[in-house]
C-alpha cells in the first residue's frame, strides 16, 4: 500500500469479495471499505444468501461506525439471479451492470436477459410495484490476471467519481 498510495492523488480502499453458494449458483458480494474480513453466509435460495451477506456488511458498518459500500457482483454469472430477485432485495442499492470477466454472461443468452435489460426490469419492478429506490449500476474489470491473459486483465470496467476529497469517508 505504501508503494502506491499518495495522499490526494491515489487511494486504496480495503475491500472483499464475499463468495457464497446458493442452490441456484454462486453469490458474490463486494464490500468496499471494510475493517475486517466478512465470512460468507449460506441460505436456502440465492435471494436469502444475498440478503444474509448484505446484512453482514451492514452489521459491520454499524458496529465499526464505518461506511461500507456493498454491491452484488455479476448477477448473470452461472445465471444465479433474475431481475425479480434483484428487485426484491431492496437492501442492495448497487450491482454490477458490467463485469469485464469473460465468464459472467453480461450479454445474456436466448433464455436470459442481458445485464442492461435485467437492470431495466429490476428497476421497473422496484419503482412501480415496490415503491423502492432504484438500483444503481456499476462496472468492474474483475481482474484475475495482471500479465498474460488479456481476457481477465485490468482496465475493462471501472467507476469514476468526482469528489472534492480523496478519502474513503467522502467516496463511500
What do the predicted segments below correspond to?
Residues 1-172:
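Extended, charged catalytic domains and RNA/DNA-binding interfaces, predominantly
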Amino acid at each position: 500500500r505504501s508503494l502506491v498510495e499518495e495522499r490526494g492523488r491515489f487511494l486504496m480502499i480495503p475491500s472483499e469479495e464475499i463468495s457464497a453458494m446458493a442452490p441456484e449458483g454462486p453469490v458474490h458480494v463486494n464490500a468496499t471499505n471494510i475493517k475486517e474480513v466478512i465470512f460468507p453466509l449460506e441460505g436456502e435460495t440465492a435471494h436469502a444468501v444475498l440478503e444474509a451477506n448484505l446484512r453482514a456488511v451492514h452489521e459491520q458498518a454499524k458496529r465499526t461506525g464505518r461506511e461500507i459500500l456493498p454491491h452484488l457482483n455479476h448477477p448473470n454469472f452461472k445465471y444465479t439471479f433474475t431481475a425479480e430477485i434483484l428487485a426484491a432485495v431492496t437492501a442492495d442499492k448497487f450491482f454490477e451492470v458490467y463485469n469485464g470477466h469473460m465468464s459472467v454472461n453480461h450479454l445474456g443468452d436466448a433464455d436470459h436477459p442481458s445485464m442492461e435489460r435485467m437492470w431495466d426490469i429490476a428497476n421497473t419492478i422496484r419503482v412501480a410495484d415496490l415503491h423502492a429506490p432504484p438500483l444503481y449500476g456499476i462496472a468492474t474489470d474483475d481482474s484475475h490476471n495482471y500479465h498474460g491473459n488479456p481476457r481477465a486483465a485490468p482496465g475493462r470496467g471501472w467507476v469514476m467519481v468526482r469528489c472534492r476529497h480523496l478519502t474513503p469517508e467522502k467516496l463511500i
